[in-house]
């Protein structure tokens, strides 16, 4: 039950908690203190619900981010995949992206590589993976500010499975471009498991793993810390900043020492043979 695709366990934490009962074992990375799933809120995004079924502003900002990454020597080595929640948004982003790549002479950087950039929707992305996944939710407030609970494939039977596949494609980073927050989705008006999953995923992207919109009965919370707690306490007496029980799956690092030169990373991990060993 080990998960190998994602280099950061935050990238699979949502699916693990929501859909796999926290049964997937993941290994914390040295920079596990920061989630690699981020919400890019598009406050002026409008979903054209009655006509084109597109969200132009969301697409524009996503394409700008792709161009930024491909131009940056430090970021361009990471492969990119774009996932949309509708075919209309997929088609629009494909056209905008083609124009932007041609204008900036980035076609070779984007496509002449082992893993070329792709633009897909959540119904045909299964089997694909990339270092960086950029989402365009598309759905959100219309021109009157109303949010419809019709989210296309997510409302259909098995919509939650499509969501689960889509949000587990990234190896290094996931950015969610959305014109709505989780608070805008009213679950009292729908019993769709796919819509409930979208609300939970948006909240996960907004706030992190501890604030899922839907509680998971299977999520196990560590109760003691075992020997790792005492090791951390002793190391603190020597001036080291430490954390114990590090990790979001059932597999935990008993004690981790924070890098004094970079507080966002761990310097050392300590694993024990048992909780009282």
Regions found by a protein language model. Name each.
Residues 1, 16, 144-246:
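Helicase C-terminal subdomain and adjacent C-terminal extension
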């Amino acid at each position: 039950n080990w998960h190998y695709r994602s280099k950061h366990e935050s990238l699979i934490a949502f699916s693990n908690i929501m859909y796999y009962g926290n049964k997937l074992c993941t290994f914390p990375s040295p920079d596990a203190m920061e989630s690699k799933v981020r919400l890019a809120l598009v406050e002026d995004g409008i979903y054209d619900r009655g006509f084109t079924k597109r969200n132009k502003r969301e697409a524009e900002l996503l394409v700008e981010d792709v161009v930024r990454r491909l131009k940056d020597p430090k970021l361009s080595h990471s492969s990119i995949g774009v996932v949309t929640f509708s075919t209309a948004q997929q088609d629009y982003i494909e056209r905008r992206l083609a124009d932007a790549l041609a204008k900036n002479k980035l076609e070779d950087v984007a496509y002449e590589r082992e893993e070329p950039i792709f633009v897909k929707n959540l119904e045909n992305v299964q089997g694909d993976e990339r270092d960086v996944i950029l989402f365009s939710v598309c759905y959100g407030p219309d021109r009157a500010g109303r949010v419809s609970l019709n989210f296309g494939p997510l409302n259909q039977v098995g919509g939650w499975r499509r969501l689960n596949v889509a949000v587990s494609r990234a190896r290094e980073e996931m950015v969610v471009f959305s014109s709505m927050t989780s608070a805008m989705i009213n679950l009292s008006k729908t019993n769709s498991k796919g819509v409930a999953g979208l609300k939970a995923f948006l909240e996960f992207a907004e706030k992190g793993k501890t604030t899922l919109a839907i509680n998971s009965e299977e999520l196990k919370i560590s109760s003691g810390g075992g020997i790792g707690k005492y090791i951390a306490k002793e190391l603190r007496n020597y001036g080291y900043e430490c954390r114990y029980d590090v990790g979001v799956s059932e597999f935990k690092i008993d004690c981790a020492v924070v890098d004094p030169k970079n507080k966002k990373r761990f310097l050392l991990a300590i694993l024990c043979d048992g909780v009282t060993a």
